[in-house]
């Protein structure tokens, strides 16, 4: 992973726009993920096969968990802005009202109903700490972290009740156990389906 520093607060209030411009102009290899994490443009390599498989398996199950009547989509490459922390995240999965994408403007992270990150060895701490903080600051109701690199024991952790930039742990299980997503999703997720890295 490489990082390009950018001043989060430039004179004249152009800080956020300048950071976003640097991100947009970053010439990253195909398949890489270019994000802004706390004012730093970060380029992550393409995810592994196991990483992609995990995201797809969850993606498939989330469709059945979306309440009827909700016009929500499940997205894999949607950029979510969080200028409050100088961040623009591209989560592995997010559930967002479709109307938020149709305005022609960027989507604020706080509009997401659920955000999912699947850790990679190279950037697990971003997912565990910086992104968790950013999503909590934005007010994302639920953050699901699928962490195959957690101290030798793959773990799925559901965070919720964001307050003052932090989440409360609602549930945490080792891969192989079931994890329940509460309303509005009402999904019992068998984490044994996820591949181990």
Locations of the language-model features?
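Gly/Pro/Ser/Thr-rich low-complexity, intrinsically disordered segments predominantly at protein N-termini
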Residues: 1-138, 142-197
